[in-house]
Amino acid sequence: MNAALFLIIGCAVLVVGYIFYGGWLAKKWGVDNSRPTPAHTMEDGKDYCPAKAPVLMGHHFSSIAGAGPINGPIQAAVFGWVPVMLWVLIGGIFFGGVHDFGALFASIRHKGESIGEVIGDVIGAKAKKLFITFAYLTLILVVAAFASIVANTFKATYTADGAVDYAASAANASTAIISIMFILMAILFGFFVYRRNAPLGISTIIGVIGIVVCMIIGLNWHPIYLNYTVWMIIVGLYIGVASVTPVWILLQPRDYLSSFLLYGMMILAVVGIVGCSPTVDMPAFTGFYDTLAPSGTSLGYMFPALFVTIACGAVSGFHSLVGSGTTSKQLDQEKDAKPIAYGGMLIECALALISVCAVGYIWNQYADGTTTTPTVVFATGLASMFSKVFGSGCYNVVYSMLILAVSAFCLTSVDTATRLARYMFAEFFVEPGKTREDLTGWKRVITNPYVATGITVVAGVALGLTGYAKIWDLFGAANQLLAALGLLAVCCWLGKVGRNNKMFYFPMFFMLIVTLTSLVFTIKAQVVGIMAGGEGVVWCYVRGIIGVLLVILAIDLVVEGIRALGRNKKAAQAAE
């Protein structure tokens, strides 16, 4: 395939989908810009705080992107570029965009509360508690994984005698110091924009220049060399503070400025791909079973592996937690929901297509196992194309910028996940129609923002230090189960309020089938592992039990959801 043509056609389809299907959704759902959003009606200067659309887009996009739209498409490339492209385009427009837009819209019509509260309203209190328990535990796993990724990106390398290997650690130390300076700059940005009313445009220009300055300083001055455990503790302290700090101080400005790293990364990628316009060796279709297994472990059958592996970039349950958790509390106007949620999803799809071009350009290195880490594949492929156009001298600079950008989004995602977990932890104890202010005794104490955050951070960091990777294989299915349940929740709510919800039927049931099939395969693999015995048998039991519990949870919530849809239909018929 020609990478430039592949990218241009894919992006054109996404633009058409945004204009026509996204516009149709907004019309059918009744987006009303005259209605005040929770950011205004419940403004508290902490969690509820209206943000200008570009700023909120920066937060939302930085939070949902992370490394997902890079890792997933590159790993799924073993099935060929045609299946990946079709799932990214169809999934993004008709699954992920609908899911993200719907979750945000439902939340702003529920006082900015999470998708769990929406489930409580339209399905029932039992369903709410089940969903929030599942979502909270999934977020703990996300915190553990992303904190670990950040710590690994920052950590020093040591020689055999225990001394710091400064040459080998320089790149990580640079990333760490750049990230620290970036956080400090974001705080200053937030102060001047929100407390000194500095013009956003001028402040943005200064902020982008500041990013470049931070990178130049960090690449030449990196005095901090710490091990993995110390960095995990530091990251834990950071996300703990960040998740309880008013959003205007850090979350909004940092995510907004971080988004320019991502936009810059995507611009570099497009310039490299279009300028180089390579014909790559990546096959269109390799078959319905992964026989390449470049990482050493086969993904198995294309169904369900393709639809679980490519989550961010097609449809991801984590997005519904972000949209209904932090984004809905900052949405200035209802009309902003479409570009931020639906548009943000499709931009992520474009990033997924760029990732396919990157792996395609170095396909032989990937297929033979020479270069298999998705982030390295992404940076190597794009930097190689860029340097082919502008000369080999720019390879190292572009490569470092791409690695830094991916690291920045992992840090963004981990503190957003911590804040979301804090919200959901408190919502679990609040009864329908009540607020946290109505709680008394130990429930009021444990749902205090600082206490809830402390519990979340300790659990996440502890899991990150003790081996989250042992259960990480379940995250793909768990994340897509979140997506199926998010689609179910919004579908039930739209039915309850008398709006068109038929666009949710197929995506909802398809994702449920994908999830259950994936979980059945996982459970089967754990049973085989248990029968074989050996050192890893304990973790086989753990993964198997978690898989069975997820299947039971999915079936229970879907049954309750179908009953709710039936009740809504009867109520609508009675009203007629």
Residue ranges: model-predicted function:
Residues 195, 209-233, 241-243, 263-291, ...:
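Hydrophobic alpha-helical segments and their helix-loop junctions in multi-pass secondary transporters
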Residues 49-110, 121-125, 142, 147-158, ...:
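Membrane-interface helix-loop-helix modules in multi-pass membrane proteins
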Residues 2-19, 76-107, 116, 176-182, ...:
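Extracellular loop-to-transmembrane helix junctions
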Residues 125-140, 343-350, 393-398, 427-465:
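Loop-to-transmembrane helix boundary motifs in multi-pass membrane proteins
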Residues 16-70, 259, 301, 305:
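Membrane-interface "cap" regions at the ends of multi-pass membrane proteins
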Residues 273-291, 346-381, 416:
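Extracellular/periplasmic helix-exit of transmembrane alpha-helices
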Residues 23-49, 72-75, 85, 89, ...:
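Flexible loop linkers connecting adjacent transmembrane helices
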Residues 67-74, 91-99, 103, 107-111, ...:
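Membrane-helix boundary/coupling elements in multi-pass transport proteins
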